[in-house]
Amino acid sequence: MNENGDITSLFDKRINKELVKAGKAIRLALFTENKSFEWPAWEILKETVDATPISITEDVKVTLCENGALRKTLCVEKRHDDSFFRQYIHLYEGVLAHRIDITNEVDWQSTNALLKAEFPLNLNNEVATYDLGVGSVQRGNNILPAYEVYAQYWADLTDANGSYGDSLMNDS
């Protein structure tokens, strides 16, 4: 974890593999210029998501808020202007040791801005699999015209050779 409370390294000891791309971090990323013609929550332009987001670095505080035998939880608090962010990063032992849960609480007070969770994984594949609610679809990553994807509950990115994959799940 870096000084901003962002995850800069996840190492899978089972196969000796770093999961976060070098120089990147799993983080909340803030785009401060969300240009939209009418509907900023739905009309996200490619130029917005292709811009370099800013790191959230104000008033960062990291604490250990749970220290159980099977689960440890870090609490990361930070702010940007009037918006406040709290993340709970749950790390597990035993049969769930391969899993990390991140719970976000956001008091969003920003205007004309966009918040995204970034997961720059050290996996290579031009195609990912996304849920549709009643099925799934495989499609390209960050391509025109479909640079935004409709993955409500989960997305899976597996190496092109099928040797390793990670899934991101959402329960909201």
Placement of each model-derived feature along the sequence:
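A generic secondary-structure signal for well-formed alpha-helical elements
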Residues: W108-L114, L123-A128
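Polysaccharide-binding surfaces and accessory modules of carbohydrate-active proteins
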Residues: F119-S172
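Catalytic and substrate-binding regions of extracellular carbohydrate-active enzymes
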Residues: M1-V106, T111, A117-E118, N141-N142
